[in-house]
Amino acid sequence: MRSPIARRATAFSMALCACLAACLSGCRGEANAGDPELVMELAISPTPPGVGPARLIITLRDTSGAPMDGARILVEGNMSHAGMVPVLDTASADEGGRYYVPEFDFTMAGDWVLILEASLPDGRTARIQHPLRVARTPGGPKG
């Protein structure tokens, strides 16, 4: 039988590992949700984006790398402070699992979170959250 101190040490170690895993998984910059067999990636031009229009290029594929065409992808942009109206748009389909928003309008410099939600005709979904900082001018210094 283990002592109470050993049980507490084990519980503490497990809690510490869980916290560490949660922190490290957040370092990637994107949080994926939905069907684990779908992978959605985002590229933005210019980088960093500035106040005004930016092109969003979205790639949707399965885990084997096969492109996923026919999806409907909604994009929502939110600033990190309260009171800002979200910027909403829908991506247009290209080919080879590529979708784009030609002019996503970043209305203000600062910290943003883009939320992309994809729905395929077969009912599968994918969702990512992509934090980013919008510069005062396109391609200029952040902030």
Regions flagged by a language model, labelled:
Residues 1-25:
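Sec-dependent bacterial lipoprotein signal peptides
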Residues 27-143:
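N-terminal soluble domains immediately following signal/targeting peptides that reside
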